[in-house]
Amino acid sequence: MEEEVDGATHLRRAEDALRAGDPMSAAAHYAAAGDAAPFEATALGFLDKGQDDALALYLRSRLDAADPTREPETVTKLAAWLVDLHVSRVCGAESGTVAAQNATKDLRLFIAAHWSSLDIVATRNLLEEYRLFDDLAHFLETAGAVRESVDLRLTIGDVAGVLRTLRQNNKVSPEDIEQVLPRAFRTDPIETSFFLRSRTLVAKLGGEHLVSLVSKIAIGILSE
């Protein structure tokens, strides 16, 4: 009973804050009200009025308070709303501006912190729809789909991103490296050549495998 009273009190304070023109306070009170505030109506209310900062505060507060073990569907829904909001900010910012850089940084920080709460297929489709392929590669790598991330980067010609992943990610297998580097070499032979001479690659593959890989690349060049 006490929780219902608390929820009702927060709802009244949220409505008072909206009437006073303070959407941020309203968002905080709606979040504190929990399920006493109908989620869809509350979120859409902020969205329809263009109050994105208040919407983000409401969603983040609800997500922080939710228990992934007991409320997995709620957590997934909140995370989906938030990633969609982050994507909207990225797409709404002018390319090359500080605002665009900050929006991209915020999106990737959110993905890094909450990837396990996101629906992988839905998030992949969202990022593909808006052609945010670099962010999609980042998401896939964060979610553990490292080879898929590397293949995507190869497709979009991001050899620097491919080599960075091969260098830094311990989940990349020697087999993956041997399959990926010939493709990377065809796209950017200079950067790939530098990587082939790196100590990192020697440590990951070993001398014998590295010699075999270089031979494979050389044969590929001669056969073209």
Provide a role label for each language-model segment.
Residues 1-224:
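Extended alpha-helical solenoid/arm regions of large eukaryotic scaffolding proteins
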